[in-house]
Amino acid sequence: MKSTVFFKKILSKSFALLVLTGNLATTSSAQILFFNNGAKIYTGTSAVIYINGGFQNDNSAATPNFFENNGTMTIATSGTPGSVFLTANSILQGNGTYLVEQNWTNDATFIAGNSTVNFNGTLQEYITSTTATITTFNNLVLAGTGFGNNRKKTLQLVDAKIGANGTLNLNDRELETLTQTLFVLNPSNTCVTNSTILGSEGFVSSNFNIGGSGSLSRVTNSILSYIFPTGSSVSGTRYRPVILTPASGSANTYTARLGYNDAVSDGFNTAALDTTMCIVNPIFYHEIKRSSGNDNADIEIFYNQTADGGWDGMAKWNSITPGIWNDMGAVTANVNIPLSSVLKVNWADFSNSPYILSRKKPPIPGLTCASVCPNSLGNTFSAVGTGSSYTWTSPAGTTITSGQNTSAVTIDWGAVSGPVSVTTSSPLGCASSAASCTVNPSSAVVTAFSSAPTGLKYDFTDISTGGANQWSWDFGDGSVSTLQNPSHTYAACGPQRICLTASKDNCVDTACSDIDVNELYIIPNIFTPDGDGINDIFFINNSCIKEYTLEIYNRWGMKIFESSSGGWDGRTKSGVEVSDGTYYYIFKAVSLLAGKDYNSKGFVSLVRKK
């Protein structure tokens, strides 16, 4: 039975516009406003068809019909849903544009050509089939203004494909695959695009559970980066994409999907970790597969640090150790706004799928325990590590006095033995395993020394016990030494306090002794004033002498020389050389020390070398 047809046809040089306001034919579905039952229809590139309701392409004949659209065809929702039904033995083909405001049911044949299908409805739209027929789109565009579930364009009970030259433009919509897969067969790395505006991202979502298969699949043939814009609208919109970068230009196929829930609910125990990690992401994880090809690939997983916390590692389930999350080794953590990422370069093992972000334990810090002295103060312990903070422990009977949270601490040690331990933590708060060493206090050092004077020169000897291996001498006049057995010559006489500090490791002891540096003078009995610079002067070496006079007499008792500031050079006061021979001297001195004066007399021989 046919109903009345109301339409208006407008022609111009550039296009024809057909507006349908009633049914062309009645069908079993009240949703259909345009029903083609076997007719061959062709529209040119300038044609515009607007259908205020559903469109069904059908054919009850054995020979397939075709509807070829090369123009723009709008299937709008107005009172009745604007859905597309391809049924029976029909063919829809052409290079035109389809603007679909509701569902797409393909039980027949769709030949995409260079066409574009734009799902732009304000309600949730479905791509489906009752005969498991997969639609291969050329360009697939998701648009519309709906919110919440009405953002979704959903694969229902059937997979879908993007052709070898096609594109996928998600805009700010959600492509919900549920348990199905969208296969992108175009190997161009730029054929998938989406909005990345925070809160309005376009993404592909999937049901994620044990054995689930919803995903986005992409073929690759270059070393460029391929985005997998995965996300979820469970409890709010969350965009958590993955970028894969193959190692070569060979053909590969990779798939990815996001599980926006704690992995433990899908059978992947987030408490089962190898020893290099302290926690894995309890909010989401990814499944990433290489379904064909052999290339390694860089894997970069993105997250929102504000919503998800910070992460600096990546882990994989079941490899190498079954039943736990295994750290994937060295990665690069990039902190940005709004999305941060963790990058694993040149990953090879695609044997097991689930991947998750992790917090890596820093390496165990290096720690060497110093020897300490019983009941000693200020013992220093240092660790070498890569963490940003350190936590120290020491046994009962000791006290950490400074340095907690840093790489070096000082500890006041009692008379106990026991372990010192330290862990280092990453900026994300993940602590390393502990480094530990046991401290057994050394024997105490008891300092002692002796001294042997020769005038102003003193020889000091260490006689400490306890195995001291370091010495610090203070000679009392501002001079010091670190020799074990030093000598020191004083510049003046008088009392001095000598102190020796002897130590072994942190066992330190100090002993002091007072000495009285006395004067000394030495009178030679011969000199040779022949101008060779050797023993040319008759000089009485002296110390601690306040003042003195030196008088020289010849054999007849005549004084030929006198001085209070120097020695005799073998000349008279007037500068005349005297002859070789034996001369008489008188040396009178006043000591710096009260009550001590000296008066020495004797003979000295003057011999000039021939």
Where are the model-predicted features located?
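Bacterial Sec-dependent N-terminal signal peptides
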Residues: M1-N37, Y355-K360
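Extracellular beta-sheet-rich ligand-binding/adhesion modules
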Residues: S28-A333, N346-S351, S358
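Extracellular/lumenal mature domains of secreted and surface-exposed proteins
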Residues: P362-T391, T399-N525, G533-D536
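Short loop/turn motifs at secondary-structure boundaries
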Residues: D514-K610
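A glycine-anchored, Pro-Gly-centered beta-turn/N-cap motif
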Residues: G96, L456, G494, S579-Y585
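Short proline/glycine-enriched turn/loop motifs at strand-loop junctions of beta-rich domains
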Residues: N294, Q305-G309, V384-Y390, T465-N469, ...
